[in-house]
Amino acid sequence: MGVSLRHLSPSSFWVSRRPRVSSSILSFLVPRRRILCTRKVAIIKGNAGYSTATDCGGSHGFHHSGHQRSSSVEFSGEWKLNLGSKTARMVPPTVKQAGAVSAWREEVNNKLRGRNREYANNQDDAFGNGSYILKGFVPKIDDVHSYGNGQNFDYNLKPGTDITTLGRELNGFMQTNSIRGSVVALPSKDIEVGETTDVTLKPLNSDTTLDNASYKKTATISKVEKCTNLSQVRANLKKIYNRVRVVDNVSSAKETVALLMNQYRNLVHACDTEVSRIDVKTETPVDHGEMICFSIYCGSEADFGDGKSCIWVDVLGENGRDILAEFKPFFEDSSIKKVWHNYSFDNHIIRNYGIKLSGFHGDTMHMARLWDSSRRISGGYSLEALTSDPKVLGGTETKEEAELFGKISMKKIFGKGKLKKDGSEGKLVIIPPVKELQMEDREAWISYSALDSISTLKLYESMKKQLQAKKWFLDGKLISKKNMFDFYQEYWQPFGELLAKMESEGMLVDRDYLAQIEIVAKAEQEIAVSRFRNWASKHCPDAKHMNVGSDTQLRQLFFGGISNSCNDEDLPYEKLFKVPNVDKVIEEGKKRATKFRNIKLHRISDRPLPTEKFTASGWPSVSGDTLKALAGKVSAEYDYMEGVLDTCLEENIGDDDCISLPDEVVETQHVNTSVESDTSAYGTAFDAFGGGESGKEACHAIAALCEVCSIDSLISNFILPLQGSNVSGKDGRVHCSLNINTETGRLSARRPNLQNQPALEKDRYKIRQAFIASPGNSLIVADYGQLELRILAHLASCESMKEAFIAGGDFHSRTAMNMYPHIREAVENGEVLLEWHPQPGQEKPPVPLLKDAFASERRKAKMLNFSIAYGKTAIGLSRDWKVSREEAQDTVNLWYNDRQEVRKWQELRKKEAIQKGYVLTLLGRARKFPEYRSRAQKNHIERAAINTPVQGSAADVAMCAMLEISNNQRLKELGWKLLLQVHDEVILEGPSESAENAKDIVVNCMSEPFNGKNILSVDLSVDAKCAQNWYAGK
């Protein structure tokens, strides 16, 4: 895939080390010695007393036990090493203008002053508001461009330090203007990942008492990166160009295809396309984008003339379509093996030109994810990230190739300064369009784009070798004479091809329906906005004009006057805000209405509202959870809104809008104004506003604000995106991207995220109803029942859970019965029923159902069933239930009392994760874990060790079911195709006349997904429906 960023560089290494740093000893920042311009260090083992940052100008700290007082200040910025003057400076995280830089600098100074107030405040007179002291921390910023990593700035002061000593220490240690000796000395040899080496540290200022101190520590290399030398990169590009055959005419294309399909047909061919006119973040490649070139590489043994082993094909010119047509037989030949990096993208791009790819042999992105599922966080799966990591290539490349295959971004090679109005280049770097590069910087572009296919084949060979070295365990048992590359070929290779087919099929969307519910949603949103504004304006008149979507304005309204939780700043009681002057108000002193006007917002309660949630900057949160806590579990409707609905509906829905509002919207015009005496459902705002009618009004109004946010989420995340042409093809079908990029192996979706549909109970506009079958067709929506709990019962060999599944019925009610003796007694005495199957003429059960009579206990049982499967602890449950940790632990123990096998299995998985560094799913996929360095990290690993085998095995089952459905010959004959998988649910489309027959086949495939068998010790329950839209199929 040729539209991502890539890396290409010479082989000189940066080495990265990260230390463990004691917070009780003095640290100061010093620049690196010049040799470190080609090495970066990050220690993962060894108690070295210094710290480092990233990029060419890192920061180093040196610690001394003579200073006992320590604190840490965190802010954004990065130390940049100036090799010319041997100085280091802190620079802002992004390109900024001078005014913004000053504000950034002031912010840093304020943070430092806030953490060391007793020193800074005492020096205001002597040093001009502490500027001398603080300049020691934040050097003058001349270059405001570059970098963007947050830093931990360790600031230490010895108690009783006098002014002179303090000034000398800060000047010497922090401004780094007197550099002497090496900061970190490394051996001159090449350093590799995992190697242990000694590092030496020295202080930098001869005026300090630390002058003769030096530390030598042992460090283990954790990361190796390659340094960028642009001239060397261009030289390497030249070497690649000399190995590339350029195909830019039909005659050359015919010769090349003949060699590919005859002499070299038995080789593995790595292919890649380069595409323009597409935004890969927002647009589907189906019917979008223009292919400008592609490359093919089948190894150095191939010779396409003059020793050239790589093919680069130009399809940009006038005869581009004719050239591409010559390669159609090659691409469609199923016997010629082809590998890709992100196959689905290239597949869609080539299909746009009427070519149906065949001969899919592997996707190196999927292979890398199978090899190490944790790289999504630690390195990524882009071609540049993988080929730049020596651990990935695993020694498969030669020394010369090692210099060529590490890649840097297009921006580094092709970036140019954006032209200013006067024609000169500015500092903002932009990348010219790839079409322009192909025509104007042709040789470099050919080399750069051809490198994609060369790197893909190298990556394929490496991943094949790495996977062959891994044993394959199926359901915990070793499969002899097979390895994880066999697993890839048997499962993930056909699964990758199936996902590409599903993306190509897409789902038909009823845009008229979406347009209608958009009108309704916006109308309801306006109603909710008016409800909140009308209430708030009773307490603060200008709130009638506020922006209810502004966190800043809401925070002022609810929490004005509150103190910051991180420092001594206070939020003002009242504040002016600039808002659009929609009413054309002419403010005092002005002759006409301006575009914006000022409003004054102040706190609307006698004291700041109660809250337990704060932002990272220390101010009260106004997130959805905070608002829900204030409102409680009440509706947005209340009698003070009389007349508001009619006005909003008239303004938002005209006579020409042919749409029926849902009943619940219309009924809000006749709200019952009688308010119940029970106040348990009301939130914390009830007491804050004095209880009674005022408290109830406040809760209902804030509930209306919650409704505003909820509706806005549905509009912005679902209703509007699904109507966009960027996610659909020419046929009006929505084509999302399906990816195996989660650590557990579950699928994710994007552009758009169809897996993120609102829960049925929250789908107030029935958005799934917009996904429809084509005329003459129907949908089959099939869903596993309690899949993960059934997998847990199998993995843990839990007899109690197995028996409950065999008995059938409401699993959560059975769990509650086994947890609570009083419920079991009620069931045995016939006072309640576990479940009830009505007979003709029966309207209600003879006695209450367990789920109704003991709703609270069943609710806890249901939450525990899923929470324990995901590794949730009593601590998390106590927060969810708002009970003590002891009470939550007692309830958890009740669950385990009948399921001791689950507890034992979980303990084994936790031990396995810590000792071996990985856990396995049902089909043998591994999830790796890093070494933990804190209790919190260990807890996270242990939770993931419990969750991954369950959730990952569910992904295995779903994948096998999809392969079983896709390979079913009868379903193919009937014309049914898979469209989408959403967690444990699959959706197919096909002719309506065979829907019921096809549904039975689908259920059978999902019930026995392992090549026509079920290897689990529990049955797989499947529910399926035939319908005309997704919502009706649920």
Curated annotation (Swiss-Prot):
One of its GO terms (biological process) is DNA repair. Pfam families: DNA_pol_A, DNA_pol_A_exo1. GO terms for molecular function: 3'-5' exonuclease activity; DNA binding; DNA-directed DNA polymerase activity. It catalyses: DNA(n) + a 2'-deoxyribonucleoside 5'-triphosphate = DNA(n+1) + diphosphate. Transmembrane segments: none annotated. InterPro entries: 3'-5'_exonuclease_dom (IPR002562), DNA-dir_DNA_pol_A_palm_dom (IPR001098), DNA/RNA_pol_sf (IPR043502), DNA_polymerase_A (IPR002298), RNaseH-like_sf (IPR012337), RNaseH_sf (IPR036397). It is found in: Mitochondrion; Plastid, Chloroplast. Residues 270-468 form the 3'-5' exonuclease domain. Disruption phenotype: No visible phenotype under normal growth conditions, but mutant plants have reduced levels of DNA in both mitochondria and plastids. Double homozygous mutants polIa and polIb are sterile. Its EC number is 2.7.7.7. It comes from the Eukaryota. Expressed in shoot apical meristem. Not inhibited by aphidicolin. Residues 700-1030 are annotated as: Polymerase. GO terms for cellular component: chloroplast; mitochondrion. Its main location: mitochondrion. Belongs to the DNA polymerase type-A family. This is DNA polymerase I B, chloroplastic/mitochondrial. It comes from Arabidopsis thaliana.
